[in-house]
Every structure is written in structure tokens, then in C-alpha cells.
Amino acid sequence: MRKPLIAGNWKMNKTDGETKQFINDLKCLDISDNVEACIISPFTSLKTLTEDLRNSNISTGAQNMYYEECGAFTGEVSPNMLKDLGIDYVIIGHSERRTIFKEDDELLNKKIASALKHDIKPILCCGENLEQRESNRHEEVVESQIRLDLKGINEKDIMSKLVIAYEPIWAIGTGKTASSDDAQSMCKFIRNLLSKMYSKDLADSVRIQYGGSVKPENILDIMSKEDIDGALVGGASLEAESFSKLINYGK
């Protein structure tokens, strides 16, 4: 049984003070034990996040990391720095990292291997853009991303650690909408791909999230799908009350 993972990706939002206020507000609200909740903040708030949530049932995550442990890499954050803070998860290959910062699959592959080496669970993001979707290449694109990003990584290394987040880039800020059936179709495709790449046991153990304008109004429909095991949420995770509704979607 895969425990759903509802992760709030704050992106470049919230100061450290605002993070403290969010946590205080969230502690006053109901936090379900039926799902794993995770907050993924900017680097500047990670220390506050891990300290203030230490005795809670909420996991923590970082939005990015470099694959080297130390050195002359100005502006980067290493996996051992994240591990020292007690971070549980790290996002690898978010669509904004791929498009804005031109991160390619070779780099992402190194990041995933490094995260696993340091016992940080990677949330690997994948997804196709509008042109790729309309030319019916969405499965081809996502398969290529996953195969390249996991190249050389063994099944035993990712069992119970890897999370995959499917992001339909074509449905984010384009006026197009992805239905829950669209999401289920791609998440099922990803699970079948993992079964071919590794084994059915591995595929059945991996949690596959959906990340495309998830909000309290649509999460119940999304989470009703067989192969969707959670959500990677953006804007709807920035307010404590909204995030609490997402976590408690089944109530």
C-alpha cells in the first residue's frame, strides 16, 4: 500500500519570518496521518522548517541541489548540507529548472545519484510541453526523461526512496486543462515503464505524484485515480488553511 505524498513546493516564495508564521498557523489545523505531508521551502527557510517541524508528522524538502559535496560552485547547495539539516526530500528536474535554467538529463542523473548516496529521497519531475503533447509525443518524451535521469541507477538504490512527479507543462499557464483521466493515463504509463526498466515490485512501490494546478477543489478527483499517489502542489500550498485542506482531502 503506497502512502500518499502531498508536497507543497513554495518555489521562490516566503521569507524566513513568513515560514515561521505558516508553521504556527498549520499547527493549529488538522494534519491527517493517512497521508505524508511535506513542505518544500526555499533554501533560506530550511533550517527554520526542519527545527520547527522536528516533532511533527510533516516531512521537509529542498527545491534543488548540486551533485558535488563541496568546492568552487558559487550559489549551489550540496547534498551533505541538506542532510546536515535533516532534509527528507529534494526535487530534481522540476520543469522550471529544465526550461529556465537549462538543466539537462545528464546533470539530473548525477543529482539523483548523489541524493540517493546521501540518503535524501529524490522527487524526480517529468513532463511534456504543449507542442510535444499536440504532436502526440508525450509518452516518448516522458520515457526519454525517465530513462536518462535514472541511467545506471540500480533498483535496490531507489526502492522505497524514489518519487516521480508528473507535470503536464502543456496545462500550466496555457489556458489548456489536464483532466484527472489525462493525469491517470500518464501516471499509469510511468508505472508500466518502471516495471519494464526494473521490476513490477519496484513499479508497485514507487509513489507517482501529479503536479498540475492541484487545489482543494480538485484534489479528491485526482487522488481517486489508481496510479496517482499524491500531488506536488504550488500556489495552493502557500496558505496554511489551503494546505491543510489538501492534506485532509479524504475527510
From Swiss-Prot:
- Source organism per entry reads Finegoldia magna (strain ATCC 29328 / DSM 20472 / WAL 2508) (Peptostreptococcus magnus)
Q: Which GO terms describe its molecular function?
A: triose-phosphate isomerase activity
Tell me where it mainly resides.
cytoplasm
Q: What is its EC number?
A: 5.3.1.1
Q: Which InterPro entries is this protein grouped with?
A: Aldolase_TIM, TIM_sf, TrioseP_Isoase_bac/euk, Triosephosphate_isomerase, Triosephosphate_isomerase_AS
Show the PROSITE patterns listed in the entry.
TIM_1 (PS00171), TIM_2 (PS51440)
Q: Name one GO biological process term.
A: gluconeogenesis
What's a single GO CC term here? cytosol
User: Where along the chain is substrate bound?
Assistant: N9, W10, K11, G173, S213, G234, G235
Identify its protein family.
Belongs to the triosephosphate isomerase family.
The name of this protein is Triosephosphate isomerase
Its annotated compartments are:
Cytoplasm
* Catalytic activity line of the entry: D-glyceraldehyde 3-phosphate = dihydroxyacetone phosphate
Which key words are in the record?
Cytoplasm, Gluconeogenesis, Glycolysis, Isomerase
